[in-house]
């Protein structure tokens, strides 16, 4: 989860220093270990960042975690991301939920009818996946990432799941939208065709 945390830290801060350091560390390891790399897993984004390193940039853990969660959940002004915050009952730390496409801005801009924003979100989504595919190890795509699936808010209508925002990015695969992957003019088609290359 270290690299996943570094990637989303970079998205929220636009500072690649920590990510570059993490990639360099991974690349310097012996070839024997095999890693799985992912942008999103089935659980949350936990902020397993190297705060000892970040303190040299005057970044402190608590306020920084708050910023990351607020930016990526869309609470921070001018944020393009749409996620939700999950408070881990064991650690009482706030963690992040959301699909890659929604965290990359596609959900917000599509909802607003902002074509330029959607295009930017698609480029962001594809760039994040290109990074994932270029890293040493085995890239793992989350179900729905290949078509830019957005957050699934239907969990809130189910009393057995409503209190757990981790269902936000663990919804049912949208087979209807998946059909659009053959149409290069759609969000689904643009992402699918880019990842297929």
Task: Walk through the language-model features, giving the residues of each.
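Active-site and adjacent substrate-binding regions of carbohydrate-active enzymes
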Residues: 1-197
């Amino acid at each position: 989860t270290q690299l996943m945390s570094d990637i989303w830290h970079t998205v929220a801060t636009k500072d690649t220093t920590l990510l570059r350091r993490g990639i360099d560390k991974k690349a310097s390891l012996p070839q024997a270990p095999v890693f799985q790399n992912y942008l999103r897993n089935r659980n949350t984004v936990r902020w397993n960042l190297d705060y000892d390193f970040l303190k040299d940039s005057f970044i402190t853990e608590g306020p920084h975690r708050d910023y990351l969660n607020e930016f990526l959940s869309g609470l921070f002004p001018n944020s393009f991301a749409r996620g939700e915050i999950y408070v881990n009952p064991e650690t009482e730390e706030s963690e992040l939920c959301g699909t890659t496409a929604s965290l990359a801005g596609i959900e917000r801009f599509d909802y607003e009818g902002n074509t330029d924003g959607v295009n930017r979100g698609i480029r962001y989504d594809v760039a994040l996946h290109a990074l994932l595919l270029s890293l040493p190890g085995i890239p793992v795509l989350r179900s729905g990432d290949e078509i830019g699936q957005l957050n699934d808010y239907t969990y809130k209508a189910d009393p057995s799941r409503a209190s757990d925002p981790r269902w936000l990015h663990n919804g049912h695969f949208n087979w209807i939208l998946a059909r659009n992957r053959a149409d290069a003019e759609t969000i689904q088609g643009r992402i699918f065709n880019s990842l297929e290359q």
